[in-house]
């Protein structure tokens, strides 16, 4: 990616680090051109850059975590599928005449193990985002996902779900085609599946749009992803009639991985490479692959009945709250 493109995609809190990294590159380039040894100076600046990176990314606010989860260069479902699978074949259609590109899915192998992988798919540029409706599925997307999950259950394939959507599409056409019914059906049916189900929030986990493929035996979450009943801006617009109150809503909604693990919503936080998954997608893919294989090994030790029971009780036990004195 060109430097100018990278700068256009920088988040505000990333800019001090990017400026320091640019300075290091300039010094290194001048050193090579003039034959001057600046190894010590570069090492000192790189140490400062690493320290600054740790300071920035260890103290992000919930709203900054949301910005990072929406980063335009953040790896998508297809990025992870291609990175972690030995082979993969995409499957299409809901068998009702539609094939929603906002949800992708297919069969493949991870570490030699046959699996079904599916997830929300955002676009990488404006044209692609429009084609994929910014990762917001229509009812046909959820019906396609359920068809593929039924296929996986029939053939004994574990299901790997990647969650990354602002929300399910809420347009008039989506409502006319039964958006609520499609999501509700998926919720009901995923509880009855015999095969292991591992769901991972890789970016945004927004509302029922995330839940529509989010009922699983394990719910994993990258440390800079978010999972929420509604986007903070939408929540702020509802509660305070002002989307600018998004940061306050983000704090109240408890959208971060740390908050959600404390509340018992998610099972495991996956660490990201320093600076976020978009900085080192290959390392991020290796992290998620290791987590998937490890959890699959544990889940295969259980009988189908045990998995269904644990899955049911896992979701029934959600809803921990604290009461002020």
Curated annotation (Swiss-Prot):
Sample GO molecular function, one term: ATP binding
EC number: 2.1.3.15
Enzyme class label: transferase
Entry superkingdom: Bacteria
Ranges where the CoA carboxyltransferase C-terminal domain occurs: 44-298
Matching PROSITE patterns: COA_CT_CTER
Protein task: Component of the acetyl coenzyme A carboxylase (ACC) complex. First, biotin carboxylase catalyzes the carboxylation of biotin on its carrier protein (BCCP) and then the CO(2) group is transferred by the carboxyltransferase to acetyl-CoA to form malonyl-CoA.
Subunit structure: Acetyl-CoA carboxylase is a heterohexamer composed of biotin carboxyl carrier protein (AccB), biotin carboxylase (AccC) and two subunits each of ACCase subunit alpha (AccA) and ACCase subunit beta (AccD).
Protein name: Acetyl-coenzyme A carboxylase carboxyl transferase subunit alpha
Chain ranges passing through the membrane: none
Classification of source organism: Bacteria, Bacillati, Cyanobacteriota, Cyanophyceae, Acaryochloridales
Annotated GO CC locations: acetyl-CoA carboxylase complex
Family: Belongs to the AccA family.
Keywords for this protein: ATP-binding, Cytoplasm, Fatty acid biosynthesis, Fatty acid metabolism, Lipid biosynthesis, Lipid metabolism, Nucleotide-binding, Transferase
Localization (cell): Cytoplasm
InterPro entries recorded: Acetyl_CoA_COase_a_su, ClpP/crotonase-like_dom_sf, COA_CT_C
One Pfam assignment: ACCA
